[in-house]
Design a protein with these regions (language model features):
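Active-site neighborhood of glycoside hydrolase catalytic domains
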Residues: 133, 148, 158-183
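Aromatic-rich peripheral "rim/lid" segments of glycoside hydrolase catalytic domains that contact
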Residues: 4, 9-17, 260-263, 273-280, ...
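Short, acidic/polar
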Residues: 33-47, 127-140, 185-194, 275-284
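Boundary/entry segment of secreted carbohydrate-active catalytic domains
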Residues: 2-46
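Glycoside hydrolase catalytic-domain groove-lining segments
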Residues: 79-80, 85-86, 93, 100, ...
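Hydrophobic faces of well-ordered beta-strands that scaffold small-molecule active sites
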Residues: 24-28, 52-56, 97-101, 149-151, ...
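Substrate-binding cleft and catalytic face of glycoside hydrolase catalytic domains
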Residues: 49-68, 82-158, 253-256, 297-302
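The substrate-binding groove and active-site-proximal loops of carbohydrate-active enzymes
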Residues: 27-33, 67-80, 119-131, 152-159, ...
Length: 339
């Protein structure tokens, strides 16, 4: 495909599997209640900001933390046809496409989330159900020529069963020929023991920044990124693979710096803090060769100046991201053998 540079009206070729090109990406959750919803206009909005990549996100659901009944749910999950069409629209818009399957919980207690899944009927049942969810999506990604596939997202409690993950990754390699990664939670990434089976280290970068500051300045945010950036550099060196930031995102609310993962907060609207947090992330990583790129979480949503959520649509953050994407980013350094 052709990557469109909105800042200069120029275009640069990007080809499938070209992991030497820095990923300046945006996640697009297929979260509409209509399973056949057309995400084409949102894809075009992302392209108009100068992004080179889109991470298409597909939610499946299991009934609760102790369950194993993973399935695409009508009214909450897209159809396979919609996923295929969206991947095609990303390529038609001149961007690279990645696909990330995510498991969510239908019923959850206050501390329940997918990182604490503990299947009551055993690991065999859960991994069988998970395999039924992700393998068809990997085949679909292969058919559509998607450049990347994320084998899992933030399944922290299940990561220690690395032999099962290795078996699944091997099966995914048979079905899919592009780049494979896994998306680990920022505080669990060092504990994952199957990075050697993947092409990139993936992490969600919801590091707590500037705790105790409701409205931190650009300078405070820049200082807060120093330690996480050193951790990421050390991780890339230890594993011998580049680090892909599979999610980085902020709600447009006060307090977003201290707990960036908190999606249900109801604090005062703060559009400019969201903008500064993206500015700070881009300041921190523009010249970091251990990082192969990032995806902003997440374009889907109403957006606009009264929206408290993650989406940058129609907010100052969207203009900040356009500037961020147009920067000169360091090419990922070869830190080791990919396979």
């Amino acid at each position: 495909g052709i990557a469109f540079d909105a800042a200069h009206g120029a275009s640069t070729a990007v080809t499938r599997g070209d992991d030497g090109a820095f990923v300046r990406g945006v996640a697009l959750g297929l979260f509409a209640t209509d399973p056949s919803w057309d995400y084409g206009p949102l894809v075009d909005e992302i392209r108009s900001r100068g992004a080179t990549d889109v991470l298409v996100v597909v939610n499946a659901y299991q009934s609760a933390r102790f369950a194993s009944d993973i399935a695409l749910r009508p009214g909450r999950s897209p159809s396979h046809r919609t996923v295929a069409r969206t991947l095609a629209q990303v390529h038609e818009a001149g961007m690279r496409a990645a696909l990330m399957p995510v498991v969510r919980l239908e019923r959850r207690g206050p501390r329940d989330w997918r990182g604490r899944i503990s299947p009551a009927d055993g690991l065999d049942a859960w991994f069988t159900a998970y395999r039924r969810f992700v393998l068809p999506l990997a085949r679909l990604a292969e058919q559509q020529g998607a450049e990347r596939f994320v084998v899992g997202s933030e399944l922290s409690s299940l990561e220690p069963y690395h032999a099962r993950w290795r078996a699944l990754i091997s099966e995914l390699r048979d079905a899919y020929s592009g780049l494979l990664t896994y998306s680990a939670n920022w505080d669990r990434v060092d504990a994952v023991e199957f990075w050697d089976a993947l092409d990139e280290v993936g992490l969600t970068a919801y590091f707590p920044l500037a705790e105790g500051h409701d409205r931190p300045s650009r300078e405070v945010i820049a200082r807060a990124w120093r330690s996480p950036r050193m951790q990421i550099d050390a991780l890339a060196r230890r594993v011998g693979k580049p680090v892909l930031v599979t999610e980085v995102g902020y709600v447009s609310q006060r307090g977003a710096a201290g707990m960036p993962w908190e999606h249900s907060a109801t604090n005062a609207l703060d559009l400019h803090l969201q903008q500064r947090l993206y500015q700070g992330f881009c300041d921190a990583f523009a010249q970091t060769p251990s990082v192969s790129g990032f995806y902003v979480w997440n374009w889907f949503g109403v957006g606009g100046p009264r929206d408290h959520g993650f989406t940058p649509r129609g907010k100052p953050a969207a203009n900040e991201l356009a500037k961020c994407f147009a920067r000169a980013w360091a090419a990922p350094a070869p830190v080791g053998n990919n396979r």
